[in-house]
């Protein structure tokens, strides 16, 4: 699972997920999966989608994961009364804004990339779309 090796603070406030993403272009590969909605992706969801892409392209080509779960999410145990401090860190999430490129693929055909990213999108809790590399001439 993806998670930071070390952080300055163990726990983080919830915060708000507003605005649009900054990195909206396919930079490394030829094809990408772009988020349409905003939301949170857990480390397990990111890994499940990555494994789906790897299986779909039969381990040819190259995959880039453009997101990293760097926000800790805390939970209190079941049947514990309110108060007594913040809960323990249970999982790590990446905050996703609209327009963010989640995954990139290179070295495969467009139809294979479309199919692989379609299968990966089914594992994610948000709407996504297929993105091509912009070539400025």
Swiss-Prot record:
PROSITE patterns: RIBOSOMAL_L16_1, RIBOSOMAL_L16_2. One of its GO terms (cellular component) is cytosolic large ribosomal subunit. One of its GO terms (biological process) is translation. Binds 23S rRNA and is also seen to make contacts with the A and possibly P site tRNAs. HAMAP family: Ribosomal_uL16 (MF_01342). Part of the 50S ribosomal subunit. This is Large ribosomal subunit protein uL16. The lineage of its organism: Bacteria, Pseudomonadati, Pseudomonadota, Gammaproteobacteria, Candidatus Palibaumannia.
């Amino acid at each position: 699972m993806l998670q930071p090796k070390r952080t300055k603070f163990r726990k983080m406030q919830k915060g708000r997920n507003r605005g649009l993403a900054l990195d909206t272009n396919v930079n490394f590969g030829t094809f990408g999966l772009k988020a349409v909605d905003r939301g949170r992706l857990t480390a397990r969801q990111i890994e499940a989608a990555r494994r789906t892409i790897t299986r779909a392209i039969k381990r040819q080509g190259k995959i880039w994961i453009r997101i990293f779960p760097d926000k800790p999410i805390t939970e209190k145990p079941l049947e514990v009364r309110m108060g007594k401090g913040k809960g323990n860190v249970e999982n790590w999430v990446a905050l996703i804004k609209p327009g963010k490129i989640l995954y990139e693929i290179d070295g495969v055909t467009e139809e294979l990339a479309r199919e692989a990213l379609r299968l990966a999108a089914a594992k994610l809790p948000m709407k996504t779309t297929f993105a091509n590399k912009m070539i400025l001439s």
